[in-house]
Design a protein with these regions (language model features):
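Cell-wall glycan-active module
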Residues: 3-13, 17-19, 23-166, 171-187, ...
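Functionally critical loop-and-helix segments that line ligand-binding/catalytic clefts
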Residues: 198
Length: 254
């Protein structure tokens, strides 16, 4: 008789482990290929952009083949809104010695540009300096999320504000073409705000200006364009030179 010995436990992966590895590899491949490649939502948006704005199918397919869904962005935007704070609560957060020092340096370095913006748009230099300081600490924190990932995630996977973010995604593709920038390389906040003043794409296209007249609008690395854009934004939103900054509110009824 031939005795068959029981097989020793293999040090290799069992079937369950192999299956898990295969799933992981498939997920990794999907992430590398882009989570929105050939998705119905992306396909519909691509169709709209090609028909309405003359984009090439292959161009946008390549963009969305690289766009990645970011769960961390969905988690961040879904958090309950923080309690409303009064100015006395915000002041120590924003008015710090470090930010004041950076603001003074920024003002001194760009004094001529700030004066020109104030003259052309009627917005005081201190207002422009303060806005850029509050938004990004003078370019120190402009966001590290790829804008294409942020806006694709919020357009396609965040139904509560899909209409808004899909419009921003379309505006972003338009501005990337307009300014001849690679839509896969621009970074910003998790909501898609960009540059020193943290403009959303629609604000960029409506209010950003080429303030140094070099033929290109750059609010990411060019403080001159950022300064002019902030001033224009305020002007277009009704800023009145010499007008009231605050006024006493009156309440009628119960």
């Amino acid at each position: 008789l031939i005795r068959v010995r029981s097989m020793p436990k293999s040090p290799c992966l069992n079937l369950r482990d192999i299956a898990a590895v295969c799933v992981a590899l498939l997920c990794s491949s999907s992430a590398l290929a882009g989570d929105y490649q050939n998705s119905p939502q992306a396909t519909a948006l691509i169709s709209e952009m090609t028909q309405d704005y003359g984009f090439a199918d292959e161009q946008l397919n390549a963009v969305f083949a690289d766009a990645v869904r970011k769960q961390a962005i969905l988690d961040a935007i879904s958090r309950p809104a923080e309690k409303t704070k009064q100015w006395k609560d915000y002041r120590p957060i924003f008015v710090t010695d470090a930010r004041i020092s950076k603001g003074v340096s920024f003002w001194q370095e760009h004094a001529e540009t700030l004066a020109r913006a104030e003259n052309e748009y009627g917005v005081p230099a201190q207002i422009i300096v303060a806005i850029i300081g509050v938004e990004t600490s003078y370019g120190g924190n402009t966001g590290s999320w790829r804008v294409i990932d942020a806006l694709s995630t919020l357009c396609f996977d965040y139904p509560p504000r899909a209409t808004f973010f899909c419009q921003q995604l379309k505006e972003y593709l338009l501005l990337a073409r307009q300014e001849q920038v690679d839509p896969l390389t621009v970074t910003g906040s998790y909501a898609g705000a960009m540059g020193l003043p943290q403009f959303m794409p629609s604000s960029f296209r409506a209010y950003a200006v080429d303030f140094d007249n070099d033929g290109h609008i750059d609010i990411w690395t060019n403080p001159t364009d950022a300064i002019g854009s902030v001033a224009n934004y305020f002007k277009q939103h009704g800023w009145t030179e010499g007008g009231e900054v605050v006024s006493r509110a009156t309440v009628q009824g119960d």
